[in-house]
Amino acid sequence: MTRYGFIAMTGIALLAGLGLGTAIARQAAPAAPAAPAAPVPYFVGNRLGMPINPAADGAFNAMSNNVKVYGSVYSAESCSYDPVRRVIVVPNRGVAQNVRTNDAWITFLNHDGSVHTSRWIGVQNPGDQRNMTPPLVLNEPLGSDIINGTLYLADRDGGTGPNDPAVSVVRTFNMQTGAPGRAFRVEKSTGFNDIEVADDGTIYATQTGVGGQTPDPTTWQVWKITPDGNASIFVQGAPLRQPNGIAFDPQGNIVVVNIGTEDVITFSKDGKVVRTEKAVQSGNDGLVIMRDGTKYVSSVVNGGVSRIRSGRNAELIAQNIPNPASMCYDSDENQLVIPMNANNALAFIKL
């Protein structure tokens, strides 16, 4: 009896096990893949308030005016001032291309550095940017400029790994709507640093290139991109030495600062050297030129801001700023605004 009882119980256990296994198998069956979300119209983020993203009915309530918010800047390398909105426009690079692509966004700041709009362009969650009409692509912008209602950004594609070469792309956005416009892709450039844009849409862009112990002068370049997209090298090699900041002087000449020297070099529109001035420090990045020709130069390596006035020696007006990068000029407040790269902050200097 004991023997038969054992067999009977074993049979019950086997049947139960088979039933449980069937149930688990049913539960583990993969669900049918969800249908991809339908594309949504392109949108940008609201200024501080609620909701953050635009509501379908357009409803929005601004943040109360007794609140100030600071921050929203991450790995910013440049800024531009928008005199129409009266805000400082800051491109945030986000994480590097080899971590996640399409991670950049644009912040608007008020004159005192407080946040106006935390994320204007790039408010979407990662991956959602491409599901808009038109899609948003903004990878790792460095230099920036605003001309005739258009935001120009020195961006890049590629660089996600050792077998994915970086390629320079200048992307444009409408300053009223935030919608993407044209993209100027320059296959022969590995990465633009700063840009300056003429009223007719001609773009001048620096490629800093290779310095250090094994410098490569062929990589020190200034490019010119015509409004129809034709790209050519404007200047290459010496007297450039890792060119960085670029701007126009009041005569329409092209002025470039070097990282590798103190030189501030003025080129004519045909690429000839007009003059060479000296900043107080080398390692220069930012360049602002005033209407009277006064130049301000920031050294991302040595932390100072030089002022260069015609017929006078350069002088430091600020010192020991951590990594002051590509400056912009806030004309309404007569101040320099200087992003500080990995310090995730901006410096403000009243003039």
Language model: regions and residue ranges:
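Beta-rich, blade/repeat-based domains predominating
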Residues: S72-R86, T101-D103, V123-T150, R182, ...
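A short loop-to-beta-strand structural motif that recurs across blades of beta-propeller domains
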Residues: N102-T107, S168-R171, W220-W223, D263-I265, ...
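Short glycine/acidic-enriched loop and turn motifs that connect beta-strands
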Residues: G94-N98, G158-P162, V210-T214, T261-D263, ...
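Short loop/turn segments that connect beta-strands within beta-propeller blades
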Residues: L109-S114, N174-G178, I225-G229, S268-K272, ...
